[in-house]
Amino acid sequence: METGGRPDCGVCAAVDVHYLRTGGARAAAVLAADAAFAQMLAERTAVMPRVQPYQPGEFYLRELPPLRAVLEDLSELGLLVVDGYADLDPAGRPGLGARAHAEFGIPVIGVAKSRFRTATHPVPVVRGSSVRPLFVTSAGMPALRRRIWSGA
């Protein structure tokens, strides 16, 4: 079913994680009625007392446990937007988005604020008067993946 030119994917969540000075993390999720995020349904947070240290290329080890906690008991999700890459290189090495797709079984869009050293494949997206691009990748969305790879 299409809604406003976008596929209806059901409840969508955008998530992010903030790291605490104590070594823990706070994850936040915004739930929306559709992929346009025009109608917000709820907000949630979860705190983890400890998380893994950052390792380049292994970001998911640090980020996925807090995301798991904030998304717990949300069986109606149809789309997840994460702060990071779905895949880390053109060969498809899995990043946070691919790991989240495998974990939750739903399509994931990865939106990264900086270019990862091996990520030569994402299309930089600039919005409005911004000069800093966002780098978009996806997992579990073959049509979007083809569109991103083609530069459309």
Ranges and model annotations:
Residues E2-D8, A42-R44, P49-Q52, L64, ...:
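C-terminal binding/interaction regions
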Residues G10-L20:
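Two-metal-ion RNase H-like nuclease active-site motif
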Residues H18, G23-Q39:
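Acidic, metal-ligating active-site segments
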Residues G78-L79:
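Structural motif
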Residues Y85-A86, K113-S114:
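Short, ordered loop/turn segments at secondary-structure junctions
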Residues L88-A91, R117-A119:
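Short, solvent-exposed loop/turn segments at secondary-structure junctions
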Residues D89-F104:
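Short Gly/Thr/Asp-enriched flexible loops that form oxyanion-binding sites at enzyme active sites
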